[in-house]
């Protein structure tokens, strides 16, 4: 059973055609990396999966539930999908620990003690336990993003979405965040990652999706083959630019 299924999905912003006839399935346990030039619809597609954006037409199913059916409660769907944003989106007035425990306490009704225990384990997993009482303003961008990843894991999601998680970071911070993501992938987490980090894609992805101008132009599990010789001309241009940059 696919975790996520797009069937003939279209998305418009006014007259701008952001997603064009998207037909994709995402399976449990897969690490899928979505790449492509800016403005190709990658982040829009990701945001549709957890209901941050509405689709214009077609069907989008998450765990076989149609996201846009009136019977489906988005809150219930979102419980099972974690998301890590480009700009961290941490609460500035809460400590690292409080940022992680907030949703499990409010949404999953965990006790403060239980949520704290889980959060401390996750902080340890992302090498940030020593910063548990720090506020976001006291942390570097890379440290904030590792807290955001721990927060995404705290709900014990079936699927974790990453929307360009390193693009707002200073270059020296990127490696630490990618290492945490690699660790999570190796632990078997289902992940869909929008990124420009080609080294990460080569090393970790089970599958590559290449998008341009709102369309899926390549979708392959032959990751090495894709980077050696993409089939689509626009993918060839993109790969040669980013690899030789």
Identify the function of each model-found stretch.
Residues 2-219:
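ABC family nucleotide-binding domain
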Residues 222-245:
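C-terminal boundary and immediately downstream tail of ABC-type ATPase nucleotide-binding domains
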């Amino acid at each position: 059973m696919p975790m996520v299924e797009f069937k003939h999905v279209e998305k418009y912003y006014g007259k701008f055609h952001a997603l064009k006839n998207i037909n994709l399935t995402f399976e449990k346990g897969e690490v899928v990396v979505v790449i492509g030039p800016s403005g190709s619809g990658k982040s829009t597609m990701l945001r549709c999966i957890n209901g941050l954006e509405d689709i214009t037409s077609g069907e989008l199913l998450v765990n076989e539930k149609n996201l846009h059916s009136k019977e489906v409660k988005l809150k219930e769907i979102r419980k099972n999908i974690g998301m890590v944003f480009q700009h961290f989106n941490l609460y500035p007035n809460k400590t690292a620990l409080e940022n992680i425990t907030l949703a499990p306490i409010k949404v999953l009704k965990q006790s403060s003690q239980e949520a704290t225990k889980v959060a401390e384990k996750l902080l340890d997993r992302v090498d940030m336990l020593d910063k548990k009482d720090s506020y976001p303003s006291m942390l570097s961008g890379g440290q904030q993003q590792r807290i955001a990843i721990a927060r995404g894991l705290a709900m014990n999601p079936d699927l974790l979405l990453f929307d360009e998680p390193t693009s707002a970071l200073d270059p020296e911070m990127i490696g630490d965040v990618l290492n945490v993501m690699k660790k999570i992938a190796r632990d078997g987490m289902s992940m869909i990652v929008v990124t420009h980090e080609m080294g990460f894609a080569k090393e970790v992805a089970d599958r590559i999706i290449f998008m341009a101008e709102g369309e899926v132009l390549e979708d392959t599990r032959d990751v090495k083959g894709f980077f050696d010789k993409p089939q689509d001309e626009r993918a060839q241009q993109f790969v040669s630019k980013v690899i030789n940059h």
